[in-house]
Amino acid sequence: MKKISKLLLALSFVLSVTTSAFAVTVVSWGGAYTESQKLGYGDPTAAKLGIPVNWVDYTGGLSEIKAQKEAGAITWDIIDVYAKDTIVGCDEGIFHEFDF
């Protein structure tokens, strides 16, 4: 529940500071899990703020995230990762601290 709450808060924050000219890309695990995120808070938040949310499936790990950062072509805004990947990603400077 805490993980979902943080993801929801992050999504709300990102959506609130962007304009309607931008879309937010949320990366999650796919299937019923992602569908529940979309229906539960993704679609309602996007509709309320008038900002499109693009959903992308991924299989986990940090390799795709590292590749985007190293190439200077970051296309993912919010990523649903395991706690262990969060710790490693923060330690390696892959993720930015989000103080809320």
Task: List PLM regions with ranges.
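Sec/Tat signal peptide C-region and signal peptidase I cleavage site
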Residues: T18-A23
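Bacterial N-terminal signal peptides that target proteins for export
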Residues: M1-L8
